[in-house]
C-alpha cells in the first residue's frame, strides 16, 4: 500500500524524530507547491468516524454494507486504470518509479469483495517491491484497507515477504484510507496490527496549487500519515478529485518523494 508510513518504498532502517527540510526534486516537467489552507473540502453529509484513533478499535464489518468497486471522489479505483509515479528514495537522490494498476480481480475478505490493486516499485528498472493491496468501499463512501500481500526484492531478486497482513487474520481489523466526506482535523486508523502496522491518517484540509508532471491541480485534499512503529516519521499526501493520489512526500524522517506522471487509459 502506498500509504504505509512504516513501510515507505524501501524500508527505513532508522528514522530521526526531527523535521527535515522539504526538497525540490526535478521530476521531468513537474514540481509542486505546499500551501495547505484552512479551508475544508465541501461536504454534503457527515457520518460517524468508523475508524477512531482513540480507544479500543474493533470495527464491525457487515458485508451487506459494502458496494461493488471503489469510486470515492478522492480515491477512485477503476479497474484497468494505471497510475505512474516517479520520484526519489529516502536518500533524496536514488530515482524510483511506482506503478499502480487497478486489476479486474477481487479478493473476498471477511465476506467483502475487495478490489485488488497491484503496486510495483522499481529503481532504474530493477524491482524493489511488489504489493497486492485490497480496498473496499462501504455504502457511506468510506474506502477501507483490508490488507496487503507484499514482497521485497534486492538487485532484482526476490528476498522476502514484507509486512504482509490480511484483515481478519491474527486479529487484524481493516482500516480507513479515505473518508467519504473528509473534513479538516478528522483522524482515522488506516492499519491496526500491533507489532506490524499501526498507521494513522489525518485530514489537513485543502491545498493548492499542486504541480506535478501529469498536470497542475488547482485544488487538492491534503492529509498527513504517521505510524506508531515509526514515531519520528510523517508523510504528506495530496489527492485530486476524480484522480486520486497525485503527490506524496516524507516531511519527517527522510527525503522520499513521489509525484504523478501519467494516468491511463
What are these regions (language model features)?
Residues 44-265:
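Conserved functional acidic sites
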Residues 3-16:
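Bacterial N-terminal signal peptides that target proteins for export
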Residues 29-39:
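Bacterial lipoprotein signal-peptidase II cleavage site
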Residues 15-23:
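Core hydrophobic alpha-helical transmembrane segments of single-pass membrane proteins
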